[in-house]
Amino acid sequence: MPITSSSETFASFFNDWLCRHRQFVQQLAHLADETTIVTPIEEESLVSNFLSHYLQYYEEKSVAMSVAGDDIYDFFSPPWLSSYEKLILWIGGFKPGMVFKLITTSVNDLTSHQIDQLESIRLETKRRERDLMRRFALLQQSVGDPLLMVPFRRIGVLRLGEGEQPEMEDAMEVLKVEMIKAMKNADQLRCVTVGKVVEVLNPRQSIKLLRAAGEFYLRLRDLGV
């Protein structure tokens, strides 16, 4: 029986997750409709359920990366994503600051206090994005281009001299650990940013934002498939 790789296992999870995502977006669109009569409790429940669904993706991804081995590089350019989805990748996922652009186009009833709060979150997010990107760039530069080197190692094209193989293996193990750390830090910022933004918004505004985000993602997905 063939052994299933970590990335293949996650790809299977992702396909199921994507089906649920489409269902959630339909629910968000229904509740976002101005003609839909809905209670605040129903709005809060859907927002909470969608955020749990969103976090599940990153929880499963974290587990998969922890046991990925050489497959860790698949998570930086995931084969389960479409070509259009890959166009917006930032350290293996969406750039956290994208949420603020979506707010601008989807939520038109922000109070002045909310605007100030969101601006503060945006600036902090931008600062952390720069910090993470700087560290990630240094990590890549430290080994040349590991994302190109590893596929060659897999098929035996890269020939090392006697005594160099153990050193290269050790270096690659350190690299994998650092790559996982970089991805998890980026994923944490993605989750924290969305969480902070939703805390500022009321349930109705959150539904509008999450609907816009969900539909934007599905458009990218469907265009590239």
UniProtKB/Swiss-Prot annotation:
InterPro entries: Seed_Dev/Stress_Resp_Reg (IPR051886), TGA_domain (IPR025422). One of its GO terms (molecular function) is sequence-specific DNA binding. Residues 7-225 form the DOG1 domain. Keywords: Abscisic acid signaling pathway, Activator, Transcription, Transcription regulation. It comes from the Eukaryota. It holds the Pfam family DOG1. One of its GO terms (biological process) is abscisic acid-activated signaling pathway. May be involved in the regulation of abscisic acid (ABA) sensitivity. This is Protein ZW2.
